[in-house]
């Protein structure tokens, strides 16, 4: 079973990024076991490799970090569970297929949300997990941005639990001007982070065996 490591307190993004990159190197060079980091970041905007500078609107005093993950701008902060699976897609029980890996991440998060009575949706040409908030209108509850090096995965998924959604006003989230964001709290689901973590670990082990 893959080990989950919960990093306590609010984590600086760059500190966490170095932690991830160092562990990826250990997996590549020393065959270290797969792990999953569970993180809650201090406030930060991060940009993926497909970002456009005009999508950064008004970041104020929140730091902006340009990363190597896929995707565009997003926000990380308190009340958001960020999950960084470091998996080896070259193992015999895995597949060297990035699209399949992302599909498995999507299935994992949708199944986890379903536990709380929330139906998650996938929208064509829009990465992430979406919630139907009104007729024909969807809001994003989880962002996905990954990177792979020598078939070792890092970066991952960010799920809004009790996130201050106003912070997303400083960017065009994921480059989608008309997109809304939501959280478990906004949907009327109030859950402690450790309780949410139990569910995502259970659902993870059903998909990533």
Curated annotation (Swiss-Prot):
Active site, per annotation: 174 (acyl-thioester intermediate)
Catalytic activity as recorded in UniProt: octanoyl-[ACP] + L-lysyl-[protein] = N(6)-octanoyl-L-lysyl-[protein] + holo-[ACP] + H(+)
Binding site for substrate: 69-76, 143-145, 156-158
Residues the UniProt record annotates as site (Lowers pKa of active site Cys): 140
Domain BPL/LPL catalytic: 30-209
Main subcellular location: cytoplasm
Keywords: Acyltransferase, Cytoplasm, Transferase
Subcellular location: Cytoplasm
GO molecular function term, any single one: lipoyl(octanoyl) transferase activity
Pathway: Protein modification; protein lipoylation via endogenous pathway; protein N(6)-(lipoyl)lysine from octanoyl-[acyl-carrier-protein]: step 1/2
A Pfam family annotated for this UniProt entry: LplA-B_cat
Biological processes annotated in GO: protein modification process
Class of the enzyme per the UniProt entry, highest EC level: transferase
E.C. no: 2.3.1.181
InterPro entries according to UniProt: aa-tRNA-synth_II/BPL/LPL, BPL_LPL_catalytic, Octanoyltransferase, Octanoyltransferase_CS
This protein's GO CC annotations: cytoplasm
HAMAP family cross-referenced by the UniProt entry: LipB
Function summary: Catalyzes the transfer of endogenously produced octanoic acid from octanoyl-acyl-carrier-protein onto the lipoyl domains of lipoate-dependent enzymes. Lipoyl-ACP can also act as a substrate although octanoyl-ACP is likely to be the physiological substrate.
Assigned protein family: Belongs to the LipB family.
Further comment: In the reaction, the free carboxyl group of octanoic acid is attached via an amide linkage to the epsilon-amino group of a specific lysine residue of lipoyl domains of lipoate-dependent enzymes.
Name of the protein in question: Octanoyltransferase
Organism: Rickettsia typhi (strain ATCC VR-144 / Wilmington)
This protein's encoding gene: lipB
